[in-house]
Design a protein with these regions (language model features):
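Acidic, small-polar-rich N-terminal luminal/periplasmic segments of exported/outer-membrane proteins
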Residues: 1-85
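Transmembrane beta-barrel architecture of outer-membrane proteins
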Residues: 3, 42, 70-72, 91-93, ...
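Membrane-embedded beta-strands of outer-membrane beta-barrel proteins
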Residues: 6, 55, 94, 110-111, ...
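Structural signature of outer-membrane beta-barrel domains
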Residues: 13, 25, 80, 101-103, ...
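Short loop/turn motifs that connect adjacent beta-strands in outer-membrane beta-barrel proteins
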Residues: 47, 66-67, 82-92, 119, ...
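Transmembrane beta-strand segments of Gram-negative outer membrane beta-barrel proteins
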Residues: 53-54, 72-74, 79-102, 122, ...
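Periplasmic-side early beta-strands and strand-to-turn transitions of outer-membrane beta-barrels
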Residues: 91, 104-108, 112-209
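Face-selective signature of the C-terminal outer-membrane beta-barrel domain
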Residues: 168-181, 212-251
Length: 251
């Protein structure tokens, strides 16, 4: 799992379907001419894993079940619900997390809460990630060279929010949810030589500023009859998603 999605048995990118609560995620868009110079943002929007309750991974072609784009396999995320964050016998729950790693100086902060009261279920989750380039054992000063051992400097910040509210009566449940994510990455490209060079030897070939912005809206009606001999569950979804990918590269 990486910047361009999942790789299953050697198949990756748009050939592996990714969906969240049944809604397919945006695919990568790659320009063959500009991508070789790092001038286009070919990343695939990533869903915040702190909001995930369950992951289903299927290998092999499954386009009949998951639609186009599932040549190599399919991955379906299922997001958290209010009752998954609340202990039995309570009507509310709060969770928080602080973590990090030394390899990329990464940090993660998450905070959320949920409440269940008289058929009403609600939750709100927020997560923020920051980090830098993955460090290696490269030495020497940072210089323009395709043979450089030090990684190109990079810094990113990702902010995500998930909100849900639901009302349950009898065998029926109506849920509305909203999800947003904004990831900004600033980088310096020292190791990828362009077709022309206009900068001095003491500056990078390129300065990069990439942004990935995602918003999605969901309304779900679920009917689960307890005494039906022919119907197990009925689901009706109305959803929408907007994804914006921007790459600002300058020398």
């Amino acid at each position: 799992y990486g910047n361009k999605g999942f790789a299953i048995r050697g198949v990756d990118e748009n050939r592996v379907s990714i969906s969240v609560d049944g809604l397919p995620q945006a695919e990568t868009e790659t320009n063959v001419v500009f991508s070789s110079y790092g001038l286009i943002n070919s990343a695939r929007p990533q869903f915040e894993t702190e909001f995930i309750k369950k992951v289903e991974i299927k290998k092999g072609a499954s386009s009949f079940e998951h639609g186009t784009g599932a040549l190599g396999g399919a991955v379906n995320f299922e997001t958290k619900e209010a009752h998954t964050m609340i202990e039995p016998g309570r009507i509310y729950g709060i969770q928080g997390k602080i973590g990090g790693d030394n390899m990329a100086k990464g940090r993660i902060y998450s905070l959320g809460g949920a409440v269940v009261y008289k058929g009403i279920e609600a939750l709100a989750l927020y997560a923020e990630r920051t980090g830098h380039e993955v460090r290696n054992f490269g030495t020497g000063e940072l210089r323009r060279s395709i043979f450089a051992t030090r990684p190109d400097p990079m810094e990113y910040r990702q902010q995500s929010f998930l909100g849900k509210i639901a009302y349950r009566w009898g065998d029926h449940k109506l849920t509305a949810s909203y999800y947003s994510q904004n990831k900004v990455t600033d980088s310096e490209v020292w190791s990828m030589e362009p077709a022309y060079v206009l900068t001095s030897q003491h500056e990078p070939y390129y300065y990069g500023h990439d942004q990935v912005l995602t918003r999605r809206y969901d309304v779900n009606y679920r009917f689960t009859p307890l005494e039906s001999s022919w119907l197990n569950q009925l689901n009706i979804y109305v959803n929408g998603q907007q994804s914006f990918l921007d790459a600002d590269t300058r020398s």
